[in-house]
Amino acid sequence: MRNQLSILDVPVDVITMKEAVQRVQNLYSEPGLHTVVTVNAEMVMRARHDKELHQILKQADMAVPDGAGVLWAAEQLGQHIPERVAGCDLAVALLQEASQHKTPVYFFGAEPGVAEQAVKNMEALIGPLQVVGIHSGFFDEQEEVNIIKAIEDGGAKLVLVALGVPKPVSYTHLRA
């Protein structure tokens, strides 16, 4: 059972980094696609006026507290989140686990060349990764079909999406 709180009707998991990594690893064995979002104050405020984003955040499999503003808001509501789970830190922790367990990873998003450099940087930091694909965040509708096929055909268990809010959230939700 998930322990969540609500900030302006946006669910946020009360979770530590260690628990978040474990939860993602558990999601690998569950059928279907899963969405993990990193909730910060900007997303909470945007969701107040963007019904699509609001629905996506509410339906995510995990919504980690990414930002001091989220922790502060929880305290103002008389609730406590044990720690900030920043998206970039979560990505590093998940990639460390992926390196150890040879989990297939797909890097998706950012400007051309950025994801490739991210792979090099991460491998220098944590060791070899089983990268099954890389694609920048610039694509048309036909390429989108090919990207989805590459992710599926490559058997990626972890897809890191860096497209900027609200595009990555919308993208991962629509493809789930």
Stretch-by-stretch model annotation:
Residues K157-V165:
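Periplasmic-binding protein-like
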Residues M1-R84, C88-D89:
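N-terminal nucleotide/polyanion-binding subdomain common to many enzyme families
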Residues A74-A150, G154:
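Conserved beta-alpha
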Residues T172-A176:
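Conserved small/polar residues in nucleotide/adenosyl-binding loops
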Residues N40-A41, A110, L163-G164:
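Short, well-ordered beta-to-alpha junction loops that form the rim of enzyme active sites
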Residues W72, P166-P168:
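Short glycine-rich, flexible loops that bind phosphorylated cofactors or substrates
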Residues A63, F107, L160-V161:
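Conserved SAM-binding loop
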Residues D61, V132, K157:
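Conserved acidic residues
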